[in-house]
């Protein structure tokens, strides 16, 4: 059972998400918060698998709440998905940089929302094409700094390769097909790279891949 905490200041939005999620046998909404501070408090009490976090909320915004949840060692297994009205919301990139595992537009189709919650709970990144473009634009304006490139030092050649492929958006199955190995082998390399880089999930690996220049704008 995947447990979900809803954080949005609009009661109707929360009700809609709850109705959809609770209709699934493997998903259950365990709590609702109308502001960021309440989201942090409930996350600590309920320790859900996934938090669907609106960015713009009173008392404490979703960006700050995401940062606090991600920074809490007791909530290491909690994954935050930020919600926004527009795909290129100015805060989306910052939310991902602060530890969010992914991003959803509020008018996402129900089937996509369900897939997203399950994917993030399984440890996958959730980056839409629009957000990926935003990442590319952000890092296209930067030059690689020695400190950033130095993050790759602990990685083996294979781990660097898998980091680059994750940065390009490939799934474990797709990488396994390319390498002609099992998905389990790929997962081992991904997990080792995450551990060495201190990354919580694949979304963070994507950030590192671009930040270090391992993946460049225009690469496919």
Segment roles from a protein language model:
Residues 169-204:
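Recognition helix of helix-turn-helix DNA-binding domains
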Residues 35-38, 59-67:
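Acidic catalytic/metal-coordinating carboxylates
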């Amino acid at each position: 059972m995947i447990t979900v905490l809803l954080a949005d200041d609009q009661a109707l939005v929360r009700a809609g998400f709850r109705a959809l999620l609770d209709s699934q046998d493997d998903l259950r909404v365990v709590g609702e918060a109308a502001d960021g501070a309440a989201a942090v408090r409930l996350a600590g009490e309920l320790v859900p698998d996934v938090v669907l976090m609106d960015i713009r909320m009173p008392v404490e915004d979703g960006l700050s709440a995401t940062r606090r949840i991600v920074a809490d060692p007791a909530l290491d297994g909690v994954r935050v998905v930020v919600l926004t009205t527009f795909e290129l919301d100015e805060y989306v990139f910052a939310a991902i940089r602060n530890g969010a595992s992914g991003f959803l537009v509020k008018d996402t189709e129900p089937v996509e929302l369900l897939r997203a919650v399950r994917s993030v709970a399984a440890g996958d990144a959730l980056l839409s094409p629009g957000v990926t473009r935003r990442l590319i634009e952000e890092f296209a304006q930067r030059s690689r700094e020695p400190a950033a490139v130095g993050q790759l030092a602990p990685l083996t050649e294979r781990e660097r390769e898998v980091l680059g492929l994750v940065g390009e958006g490939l799934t474990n199955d797709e990488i396994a097909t390319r390498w002609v190995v099992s998905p389990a082998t790929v997962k081992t390399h991904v997990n080792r790279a995450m551990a060495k880089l201190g990354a919580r999930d694949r979304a963070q690996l994507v950030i590192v891949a671009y930040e270090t220049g391992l993946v460049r704008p225009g690469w496919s």
